[in-house]
Amino acid sequence: MVYASLGKAIEENCPEEYVEQAIQNDPNSLNAVDDDKRTPLHWACSVGKVNTIYFLLKQPNIKPDEKDEAGWTPLMISINNRSVPDNVIEELINRSDVDPTITTRGGQTCLHYAAGKGRLSIVQLLCDKAPELIRKKDLQGQTPLHRAAAVGKIQVVKYLISQRAPLNTSDSYGFTPLHFALAEGHPDVGVELVRAGADTLRKDSENHTALEVCPDRIVCNEFLEACKEQNLEI
């Protein structure tokens, strides 16, 4: 089968032998970019072809940190793809030619994505490698803790709290991590945030507290009851 490019071939799940032969025939294809500015490594990470990822990373001239049109690196794509296991992502992070502090066009970092996906071991490694990312805001003013709280990733929330992530930082809409936790229906996360010192009276840009943006009475009651049981002041 004939493919338009090596990246397209990987996207369409070509045999692994094809990748090796293509690079032997044309070494420049290793880092060639398509119309989306994606390299073959971007596509291998996108479709979760682990053996191909390893093969590409072993090539001496590989450029593993290129940005695509949206500013995404192969590392970012891997973190967002559940079919790419943690050990592959860890290898990318530990490479000297990969910068985990790169941001997308939206200002997100790898830690934003790892936190939002609940990939605790990756969150821990990124925090060790680049602790400044813990406080990094994207263009919407959101930190990794905002991301983790919004999707209910409580183990990541606990870890970020232990690393002194800012609890009461507001995004561009005035939402704190606590606002997100309750608005998205995660009372257990809300309790963890309050236990750590989150301000329950902080208001968003429309003058609403976290409890006031909680749309579900059951969630609100679970949160209030748990706080009461643990003698947490609201």
UniProtKB/Swiss-Prot annotation:
Protein name according to UniProt: Ankyrin repeat-containing protein C6C3.08
Gene Ontology CC terms, in alphabetical order: cytosol; nucleus
Domain of life: Eukaryota
Upper taxonomic lineage: Eukaryota, Fungi, Dikarya, Ascomycota, Taphrinomycotina
ANK repeat copies, ranges: 36-66, 70-100, 106-135, 140-169, 173-203
PROSITE patterns linked: ANK_REP_REGION, ANK_REPEAT
GO terms (BP aspect): proteasome regulatory particle assembly
Listed GO MF terms: protein folding chaperone
Keywords, in A-Z order: ANK repeat, Repeat
